[in-house]
Amino acid sequence: MIIRRRLVLKYVVLTIVSIACMACLTLNIQAKPILTVYTYGSFVSDWGAGPKIKSSFEQICNCELRIIGLNDGVALLNRLRMEGGNSPADIVLGLDNNLIDLAKKTGLFTESHIDTSLLKLPMELKNNIFIPYDYGYFSFIYDKRRITQAPKSFDELINSTQPWTIIYQDPRTSTLGLGLLLWIQKVYGEKSAQIWREIAKRTVTITKGWGESYGLFLKGESDFVLSYSSSPGFQLLNYGQDNYAAALFSEGHYLQIEVAAQLKSSKQPKLAQEFMQFMISPTFQKILPITNWMYPVIDMSLPTVYQKILVPQKSLQFHAEDITQHRNQWIHLWQDAVSHQ
């Protein structure tokens, strides 16, 4: 009887110890801080930069990196404005140079202490809140099997006797769509309304974001899709398809610089700063050219596939303040033009 009691007591003690150890292990797992990043949908896709970024950062941060893919860049800012100081996000990654003035005026973002003096960009972007992480040029992509003589200017695309069709993104939700709005405004100025009416005649559909529009294009739903001059590299590298190309326009191409920023309401400010610093490191930057298909912001060699990618020789820009001042007016002009077709 005594032996049995001792065995029972030993079993009880071991059980208590095991439960305690499991509880400690659970607490340790739960104690890992979580850094939440809002970004656009394509960034977190299986072929996007997100999965590799998550793996690389978690190896050095002793944290969980939670990357949440939403809609395109403009929609990201709209979401943050709606959430205000109650946003669960610590960082937003996916705004761009065309939104930084508008984003700054929301008061939702805090200064960063990241040294950007060594960054290599096509234009100067001095800002201590919004940190650049890549850049690219807006362009219309086409399939060389369908289009044997690509347009060499906006005028050729719009005024061609060929029944060419276009898919692009909504400027109210997408940084690409906003980029096209600014591109046309920069090239045509007061004639922009007429240009939009001509584009409307060729438009198959207008999507909320890049992923949907590019997917439709690859299915053959249009002759041209608004994307980036570097986009054809994806099919070339992953599928060996060299039939996609960017149409280079004599008027020049609008430049986009993508940026990230830390929210004032972040519950992990130190970890957020660590991620922002990591963002301009070689480890992060080398992932982008063949996942996000954009150019890095540090001095580094590009993958060999970029040797076959066309690069615009002329880039176009508006000052950020001009965009903030006229953005709503230009969007209304676009809405009016396309709604009357």
Question: What is each residue range found by the language model?
Answer:
Residues 98-102, 218, 222-243, 292:
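A ligand-binding cleft/hinge motif common to bilobed small-molecule-binding domains
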Residues 263-318:
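Mature extracytoplasmic/periplasmic domains
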Residues 34, 38-50, 71-75, 87-222:
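Extracytoplasmic ligand-binding site segments that recognize negatively charged/polar headgroups
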Residues 51-67:
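Short alpha-helix C-terminal cap/hinge motif
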Residues 139-146, 185, 256-268, 287:
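A bilobed periplasmic-binding-protein/Venus flytrap-type ligand-binding module shared by bacterial periplasmic
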Residues 110-116, 128-132, 155-158, 236-254, ...:
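Short beta-strand->loop
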Residues 121-123, 136, 196-200, 206-207, ...:
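Periplasmic-binding protein-like
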Residues 305-341:
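Extracellular/periplasmic bilobal clamshell ligand-binding domains
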